[in-house]
């Protein structure tokens, strides 16, 4: 497969070769609507959605309840009453978005008043939960001496782990193909 022309520009780089789902397919799923916030509520994954894309899947996969960073979250000083009124899945605001357990997460980009609320707990997300939404392995933790602000800034500045892994694998394949083509005199 030829990836560059005579002028050495990329013609057909296989960006999507490691993608598991297309954005179009994800957007076409029948994701649940907003539901009233009920602290401690339990619900089953709805039929017809990719569970592996959901917030709850990543919370469970990373065992966020038992993670070293499980109890590292900002405690609400004011605004708890307002926080309790925000429905699960209301992510249309600039700040204080209550993510839905059975939807994919909005972009994890903390800072500039971007705040994600836990789907079924009366609090903001923990460091462990935010890292799980970036698809980081559950063994990953941040140094305990890091401030909460720095933890969330670090998480928000990161590229999702699985995305980075896919890009790296695609680049590796591309380089290996280019080397093989070079060695074969193509």
Feature map (PLM): residue ranges:
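C-terminal target-recognition/interaction regions appended to catalytic cores
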Residues: 1-186
